[in-house]
Structure formats: structure tokens, C-alpha cells
């Protein structure tokens, strides 16, 4: 008897215990009870088995985000029939959908409410294309058998398919009365997109939690605020990007959200400044951030926000190792591994590349443990910036940027540099829509010279995927090539003379008043030469630090003019 060790077994147990309890609900008031969910699952499983679905065969699930009830039925129906579900996002371009179905080896697709690319192979059906009066079918799933294939976020490269067994998905879930999660709430709310690991976690939570799951088709700050107020939501699940949007929208202050006692964030690191603002806006709520990955789940760390260590992501089964896999001393940065007693996940293609080892999963992040065992992240392995022999963590730079009062959101990436190899560059979302004039001076007191971004651009919003994570590979495209945009000609006498010096030092034909010395290829050696020539030309002491603090031609010229005016 599989019982609680398979996903459909959990559903069967919950339907037997509380058949009329609401499992899922929509903001429009529609509901799906556990009894209805179980019966529709039986009907679909019987139809799939009758049509010849074999144990272990894979079935793609493609649903409009308003069709959570149908998705829940399809997911459990495929699993009860012994199949493997492949949840996909309807937001994906048709070509990517076809690629993922092909890579996963799906024999067919269950879809509802969205178009299916004509190139998609295999059979197609809807979740309701089954006999609603079908008898209960035996659960053909086993704890050790595969249950789902979910794709990683693909923010830095190609998304990879990850296989999870029933034992992995059900680990830690208990639908027994008195042991159900979130018993302090009548509803828990989320707006995680279908096809993501976060959405799958919410589906499993809905099977075993005490409250009903209030599912939002898409995240909209005003709609979430209204739903929380109307349904008196007790638990709110977000990704950090959603939390920022809620804070910026004013919804947390304009509505009665006093029912919220728990805010859980996942999918990315919750910045301390955002956690602090949430705690102030929702004084009755505990703010909790969960750190994990698609590959590592259900292994995780959990951190209740603590103003004494705002950037920690919690404690748990965590190891920090060097490149050879040896554990490093406390406080030293290395590769982050998190462990769990659950059956591990694996990549579908078997190319584990050192990710999975003896119950431990390498997350792809770098981090350190402090003296009390709290984990502090230092960025992605693949995002580390190597500039002139110095290693720069984008995560560290982003933390400093977020401390600026005008910066709402930010991301840091590496741009190629002909001398230093790479340089950090920042993409900002600011309250004014422009790069703060004092940004470099502000960062100079918080970061080393190598860590200060040498190019900065402002955008309306960062490029993010369905799960709210920044698409790192898209950041570089936001920076125009050096010299590709014309800038205004120097205006003042000082600007014109300084532009001539820049042209000599940098070996460029022309310099505009809006140009940036570092963006045009300036480095520490050329900055030294620039400082000497400026001192000779204008007869003012010129420390290199003054030039680094203001790399624009116009701002350097203004600084020089002020020094000249102050001269006796």
C-alpha cells in the first residue's frame, strides 16, 4: 500500500478524511473540494489507463493560469495512472514548448485554455475528457517511481529537466489531522506560475495544509491586496520581486491586511531592506525566507527575518566546500551544498556534473557560514566577476546598491574589458528613473574600487522569468556598445581641454561631455596618467580617487573648475 508515500495517495487520504473541505479556490469564489479533486483524478486516470498509458510514460501538462483546478486534476490523474507529469508554462514561446516536450520525451499532452503549437507531437486531450462516473482505479504509482519532470529556471543558460520521485515530493508532507501545515490560517495565497518549481511546491502544500489554497492566475499587486483583504488570508507566499512590487504599490498600507500572520518568500534571496519593509507594513506577520533550488528540493534552509543578520538565509544541513569538494573553515566562501533525508532528484539526461552526492545537492551558489551556522550567500558560481586578478561577487555589489534610497531594484553582471578581462556593471530600477548623481560616492564607502560598477544603466524593470528571477544572460544586452551613442560636445573651456587629455590618454578620436572614462576603456594605469596630465594642465592637485569618484567628463570638469576657483 503506497498511502502517504505517493502524491495520489496523499490526495486519497485527504479526500477520505475531509471530502467536503475546500482544497483550491479562485478569487471569483469558485472552489474545488478534496472529494471533487479525488473523483476527477480517478476519472482521468481511468481514461488514461484505458487509452494505453503505461507506467513511467511522460505526459506534458499545458494549462492557462486560470485553469488551476484542471491542472490539479491532470497532475494527480497522470500520477495515479502511473505516468510522469511534465508541467509546462503557457507563457513559453511555441518553439520552447516543443523543445521541452521533445526533451522530456512526452507521449502526449493534457491541455486546457491555451493554444497548442501545431508542431507538438503525440496525442492531446483535456482533463475533462473522461467519464466522471468512472470507478476508483488502483494507484499505479510507487514511492520510488518518477512523478514529475520540472525544468530549471534557465536564467543563466539552458533550462534543464529535473526528475523527482513520489518519495521526494511527499517527503515531509503529512495530511493527518493535527499535523497539517499552516493551521493558523483559513486561506493561504500564492500567484506562482504553472510550470515552476514554486507552483509545484504550492500544489503539494495544498494537498496537506489545513487552509484552502487561494490561487491567483497572475501576480497583480492590486488584485493580491484585494484578495487578501476579502478572504482574510492568513499566509501569503511570494517571490522577492512580488514583495517589492507590493511594497511599491501602496497596497500594504491602503488595505486591512491584519489577517496576515505569515509571509513566506522563495525563489530568490530576500534582501534585508525588503524584509524589513514587509515587517513594518505587516506588523502581525512573521517574515520567512526559504532558500533551495529546483535540483535540491525539498532540502532547504529557512530564515525568520532577524534585523541583526538581515542578509542570512538560515541554518540547516549546509556544507561549504572548495573546488575539490573539501569543507572550508567557517567564514570562508565556497560552494554551497544543502542536504536532506529525502530521496534525491536527478537530471533527466543523467549529466549530474557533480551536482548530487550522497544526499547532498550543490546549489550552484557561493556562500559562507558564520560562527552561529547561518548561511550567507555570495552569488552564483557562474556569475562571479574576475577583474584584473580580483574576484567580485555580484551579490555583494547588489546588496550595497540596494542600500541607496533611490534604488528600487538592481542586478549586476560582468562586461568584457580588454585590459582587466571583466568589469562589474549594474542595471538599476530607480525611483527617479535616472542614475543617482551620488551613486559612485555612495558606493565608495561600502565597496572596494574593483567592486564599484564601471557602467550603470537605468531601466523600467529588470528582465525576469516566470518565477521572478533575473534573467542574467539578458542583462548584457541592456548596455549599448561603447561609442555607439553620440554624446553632446564639450561646452566649457575646462571640458574642451579635459576632452583633449582624455583623447590622448585613451587613444580615441573624440570625447563627448557625457562620456564615461571607465566605459571608454580607462583603467588604473590610464587613470594615473590622466591625474598627472590634469595636474600639469590645470595646476591643481588631482588624486586618482577624485577621478574614479566622478568618471564622467562633465563631472570631472566641474570638479576641476571648482578647484581652480578655490585656488589663491
Task: Specify the residue positions occupied by each region the protein language model found.
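Conserved structural elements of the adenylate-forming
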Residues: 38-46, 143, 162-183, 191, ...
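Gly/Ser/Thr-rich phosphate-binding loop
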Residues: 235-237, 251-309, 327
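Conserved C-terminal "lid"/linker of ANL adenylate-forming enzymes
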Residues: 385, 411-417, 425-427, 439-488, ...
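Conserved AMP-binding A3 loop
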Residues: 31-35, 147-174
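Conserved ATP/PPi-binding loop(s) of AMP-dependent carboxylate-activating enzymes
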Residues: 312-315, 326-358, 374, 390-392, ...
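AMP-binding/adenylate-forming catalytic core of the ANL superfamily
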Residues: 236, 340, 345-346, 366-451, ...
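Conserved AMP-binding/adenylate-forming core of the ANL superfamily
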Residues: 3, 20-52, 60-69, 76, ...
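Conserved AMP-binding/adenylation subdomain of ANL enzymes
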Residues: 170-187, 195-235, 249
